Amino acid sequence: MQKVSIKDIAKAVGVSNGAVSAALNGREKDGYISEALAKTIRKKAHEMNYKPNNLARGLRMGKTNIIGLILPSISDLFYSQIARIIEIEAEKLGYSLMICSSESDKEKEERVIRTLKSKQVDGIIIAPTKKSKAEIEILIKEEYPVVTFDRFFPDLPLNSIIIDNEESSYKLVRHLINQGRKNIAILTTNPHLTTMDMRFRGYKKAMEEAGMPMHPDLYGLVEYINYEENLCNVLDTILKKAPDVDGFFFTTHILALETLCYFSDHNISVNQFGMACIHEVPTFKVMAPTMHIARMPVEDIGANCVKILHENIENNRHQEKKHWINNMVMPCVLKLK
């Protein structure tokens, strides 16, 4: 079926294209056409099943009411939870959401940013890689509304939301130490990310304060690409070189979950280790009920991402060029066993 156009409606009613456009955009109050004619036009448009091109209309008005969301991984439970909250909050403000995945790849992330800009989304929410700093700087220079979360660039004038990474990590590791754990390994990934570096610093601080400087054999760096296989190799090495390991600190819930699978496959009891992790997944309740957790405030992170971005978008629309930065550091909820 051929799509009905403004021209078709104008022909059916016997008026100009401009009159139809005015009626469909509610401009009869401006005196361009009478209210009676506007009602007649809108009734005919409904009868003809007219569907407006909202994107084209948005472009004419300088807005699309679309927000771009770039995640490192759509399959990651944390990011999917964040996406759900952002979508709910965005809809409350009249926005649609366009979700993309970068897979933590610099080149892909840059392509996605450029694609979203070409679609003229009103703003972008992103959990960026550190390597994409140059592309983020371009957004800032263009005064493009953008908010980062989970990861950030401390030297850029940028709206961002993160958790208290170092403090939460410090408290988790200190709790393991207070429970008598003396050889605590750390499993981490992507050290180029500021958040991972901060979590490592929290671990290191707790160990050094307790007089237990970190031993190289207890440091497990898992490459993100093919992380399942890489994690197995890292655990093989730790258990071989540090057989007296009695605790694990995981900088992400994914590393913790994969470690639990490794223990299950190798018939290793989780009860012999003290374990702590940033964020949680429901599986922990079954596979590791004694896991100490710093739960990230998913709801608050998602809601504030939308709130800050919306304020930024509205400031731009009203040409309020006063540059303001909102850097939020949110506390985690500690669940210590």
Question: Which positions does each model-derived feature cover?
Answer:
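N-terminal helix-turn-helix/winged-helix DNA-binding helices
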Residues: 2-5, 45-78, 82-84, 93, ...
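Central regulatory/effector-binding core of bacterial HTH transcription factors
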Residues: 88-133
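Short, well-structured alpha-helical segments in soluble
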Residues: 107-120, 229-244
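Hinge/beta->alpha junction and helix N-cap segments in small-molecule ligand-binding domains
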Residues: 72-80, 100-108, 161-171, 187-234, ...
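Flexible loop/hinge segments that line or gate small-molecule binding clefts
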Residues: 104, 126-171, 191-192, 254, ...
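Short beta-strand segments enriched in small/hydrophobic residues
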Residues: 17-22, 59-74, 175, 183-190
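Flexible loop/turn connectors
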Residues: 232-337
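N-terminal helix-turn-helix DNA-binding module of bacterial transcription factors
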Residues: 1-63
